[in-house]
Amino acid sequence: MADVEDRAAKGISDYDQGGVKTTELERKIEDMENKNQELTRENRELKERLERLTGEIEEMKDVEAEMNQRFGEMEKEIEEYEEEKKALEAISTRAVELETEVSNLHDDLITSLNGVDKTAEEVAELKKALAEIVEKLEGCEKEAEGLRKDRAEVEKRVRDLERKIGVLEVREMEEKSKKLRSEEEMREIDDEKKREIEELQKTVIVLNLELVKNVEELKKWKSKKKLTEEALSETQKREKELELKKDELLKKVEEGNKTVFALNERTMKPSNGVRDTNGGDQKGSLEAEYQWPVVAAGSVGAAGLVAATFFVCYSKLR
């Protein structure tokens, strides 16, 4: 009977171990599902970051196109200033020529005045020529004055243009420097973005592969969990049947013990109910000694049968 109880306790212990194993499977499946959700979230964040980087690259390209357009406009404006500068230089040259002509007229006038002692005709002619020269001189002076004003204005405009050209040249140099820096930065940013995009794409591929692997492993663990739960359910069912059989066997053992005890009591009594004072005591004692081993052997056999039956049932259960 003690052996039966030990085997029953061992069966309950194995059932507890099966429950622990099921708990470990459930925990591992839960960890796999959490990891799967984490990988899905990281994949979504990487896609959003890739879209944001692509938008930044497009904005950089728009800025570069706008800067190229501004450089074209500045070059056109510089060409217009160069043409206007050439026209002003031509006006300045004409003013110098007029000043030379006025100087020559003054020399002619002085020469004419020095010949006043000549004849009257010559004087008249000289006066006439002088009047013409004076008139022409006045016209030349007026023209020269106008040219001087024009020259001053032209020089002023030339200085303004030179200043503007200097400013534009400085701005052009700055813009070219900025353009070079921008192009260099754009190349660096573009290369960096490309490298980052390639790394992100590789990371996305790795995460997708790991996600597929985890999904397959999750399916495998779920299938294993289902098989374990089915086996556990079958074990619980068999255990209940075994408990019922054990209770029945224990009842039978208890009834057998009661029967053995009753038989022992009956065996210890005289066979005819009367003690023989002479040979009867010896005969009754022999009969009692003969019946007692038979009853004991029957009790031991019943207990052995019960233990063997329980052992076979328990072995089938395992």
Curated annotation (Swiss-Prot):
Cytoplasmic membrane side: 1-291
Coiled-coil region: 19-260
Residue spans of biased composition, Basic and acidic residues class: 23-39
Disruption phenotype: Enlarged peroxisomes and elongated mitochondria.
GO terms (BP aspect): mitochondrion organization; peroxisome organization
Assembly and oligomerization: Homodimer. Interacts with PMD2.
The protein's name: Peroxisomal and mitochondrial division factor 1
Organism: Arabidopsis thaliana (Mouse-ear cress)
Gene field: PMD1
